[in-house]
Amino acid sequence: MGFADQRFNVNLSILFTELPLLERPAAAAAAGFTAVELWWPWIDSPTPEQSELDALKSAIEDAGVQLTGLNFYAGQLPGPDRGALSIPGEESERFRANIDVAADFARSLGCTALNALYGNRVEGVDPAEQDRLALENLVLAARAADRIGAVLLVEALNKPESPRYPLVSAPAAIAVVDRVNEATGLGNAKFLMDLYHLSMNGEDLPQVIDAYAAKTGHVQIADNPGRGAPGTGSLPLEDLLDRLAKAGYDGWVGLEYKPGDDPSAQSFSWLPAGARAAR
């Protein structure tokens, strides 16, 4: 086994960002990849004009790549925010306005994974109130995902880089997954296992894989330290992905790493060109 046996997709919100958004799908295809994922591309608008949605849809289709993952609206990301769904007031309303927009866009491209970032803790607001709001919004998102045959992803981030984000361990994210599934009865909420974030939290990655592979709906990787390409840090990513496969995970692996100072297309030397197209 090894990297060549995985199904990789390129995150176009962190790779190829030296290019305009609409040029990134073709750049990923030119590098040999056949699948991409995105954070919500319109950070200032949960409900962009239909013409903007159509332009991105066309760029993805014209490039001949598959959209395999999409984030719901998450506030200013890139930026200080880490989601909107647990933020009382305007941000929660913006998330709700985005739910069907994101789900319909995903459905139009055959995308079957929607990621809902939880949101930062807000000073002066009871965490229990934020958690109640989060569950309400995640239930709505799970139902929208179910409507299009998709899974709803819940992601743990890392405390050093996201100190106000409450889900900074695998068990914390899994607890939310379980609460959402219990509330909806749909069973379509899944864990987004980001090996970079979990390693930054100091978690035992083999133990996390063994415990939670069955509840995992998507995996993302970057090396640590540095959040660079595999081989730039010290994480045994090839071994960890093999362990995931042996534990039963056969889904996508998102490349969510920083390309460094060189153009993104030069950051894939760790993966033979013939292994980049999904099989």
From Swiss-Prot:
Q: Which GO terms describe its molecular function?
A: hydroxypyruvate isomerase activity
Q: Family membership, please give it.
A: Belongs to the hyi family.
Official protein name in the record: Putative hydroxypyruvate isomerase
Keyword list (alphabetical) reads:
Isomerase
Its UniProt entry gives the catalysed reaction(s) as:
3-hydroxypyruvate = 2-hydroxy-3-oxopropanoate
Q: What is its EC number?
A: 5.3.1.22
One of its Pfam families is AP_endonuc_2
Q: What does this protein do?
A: Catalyzes the reversible isomerization between hydroxypyruvate and 2-hydroxy-3-oxopropanoate (also termed tartronate semialdehyde).
Q: Which SUPFAM superfamilies match?
A: Xylose isomerase-like (SSF51658)
Which residues lie within the region annotated Disordered? 260-279
Gene Ontology biological-process annotations: glyoxylate metabolic process
Species of provenance: Streptomyces coelicolor (strain ATCC BAA-471 / A3(2) / M145)
The active site of this protein is located at 155 (proton donor/acceptor), 256 (proton donor/acceptor)
